[in-house]
Structure formats: C-alpha cells, structure tokens
C-alpha cells in the first residue's frame, strides 16, 4: 500500500466531509447513490442517502486489472481504489472542477475494475500509453488519470494523446484538492 496516497486521500475526504458539515450540518448527501447498497450509508431520505467514508473491506488491490493485461499497476492506484468506501467527491484542482471517483461498495469495486480494464483496452487498441482514471470532468471526453508508466497525474482527453501534467504523483494531487460543495 502507498501510505502517502492513503493518507492524502483520507485527509482530503475528511476536509470534504468537514466542509459539507460546516455548510449543511450533516454528513454528505447523495441522490445519485440512493437505492444502491453500501457500508457508507448512515441514513436514507425518500430520495437520497447520507454517507460517511468507511474502511475498505475487500482485497486491497486491483489485481483483476493487472491480470487482464499482464502488467503491474502503479501502487498509488491500488491504494486509491482500496483505502476506503465513500461516495464520489466533488473537488477543484486549480481552476479544474472534477468529481473524484470512489468505490461505494464491494460490488462497485468490481465494476470499477471492469471499467479500468475497458479503458486500458481502448488505449491499447489506439496505441496510447496506459493511464488509469481517478476523476471525471464536466467535459465528457476528459478525465483525470494516473499515467501507469510514470505515476504522474494528468488531465487526459480520451482517445487522444492530449494530456496535461497536473502533479508528479497521486498524493501530491490529492493534497492540492479543494472540496466543492
């Protein structure tokens, strides 16, 4: 496990939850995750769930992705997706607004790995260097990814070589995030 990434993720999640509590006097609320089982759910309304992060309880790696491609995945990615269960978190990095992807449950974790495999299949077909996404942006074809060769974090336009360097590593990126409510 990449301890710096785990610590940075936990600290950012705490900053987000604290900001949410300051603004709304509650734990974070999600309408999108209503009806989807998770250990994060602390209460439910008629159309939303209140959630709080919980320790990840599954296998602490994304080995299914490694096995699918016979490659070694950056340790920061293993850590990012297996440190905690949480709802997706809205954030800002500089002037970039993003949604930091999180695993909501063990079922969701399997789906995330399938999506990472699909992403890598497309990159391999297009002969692009391998990246693994960690966040979505408002523009559908752009994501925040970790380069599997270097570990750097970049803004990537899907299906192209267009990448903008954002941080040298995932912990550095997470430490610079600001919560968006």
Swiss-Prot record:
Family annotation (CDD domains): Syd
One term under GO cellular component: cytoplasmic side of plasma membrane
Keywords, ordered alphabetically: Cell inner membrane, Cell membrane, Membrane
Membrane recorded as keyword: yes
InterPro entries in the record: Syd, Syd_sf
Chain's role: Interacts with the SecY protein in vivo. May bind preferentially to an uncomplexed state of SecY, thus functioning either as a chelating agent for excess SecY in the cell or as a regulatory factor that negatively controls the translocase function.
Entry's family note: Belongs to the Syd family.
Name used for this protein in its record: Protein Syd
Organism: Shigella dysenteriae serotype 1 (strain Sd197)
């Amino acid at each position: 496990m990449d301890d710096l990434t785990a610590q940075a993720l936990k600290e950012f999640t705490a900053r987000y939850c604290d900001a949410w509590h300051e603004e709304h006097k509650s734990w974070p609320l999600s309408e999108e995750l209503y009806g989807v089982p998770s250990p994060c759910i602390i209460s439910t309304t008629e159309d939303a769930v209140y959630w709080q992060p919980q320790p990840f309880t599954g296998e602490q790696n994304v080995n299914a992705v490694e096995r699918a491609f016979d490659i070694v995945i950056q340790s920061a990615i293993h850590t990012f997706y297996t440190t905690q269960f949480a709802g997706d978190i809205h954030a800002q990095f500089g002037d970039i607004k993003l949604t930091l992807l999180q695993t909501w449950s063990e079922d969701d974790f399997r789906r995330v790995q399938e999506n990472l495999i699909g992403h890598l299949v497309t990159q391999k077909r297009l002969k692009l260097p391998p990246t693994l996404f960690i966040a979505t942006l408002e523009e559908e074809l752009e994501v925040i990814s970790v380069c599997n060769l270097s570990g750097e974090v970049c803004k990537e336009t899907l299906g192209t070589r267009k990448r903008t360097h954002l941080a040298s590593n995932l912990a550095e990126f997470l430490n610079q995030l600001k919560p968006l409510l």
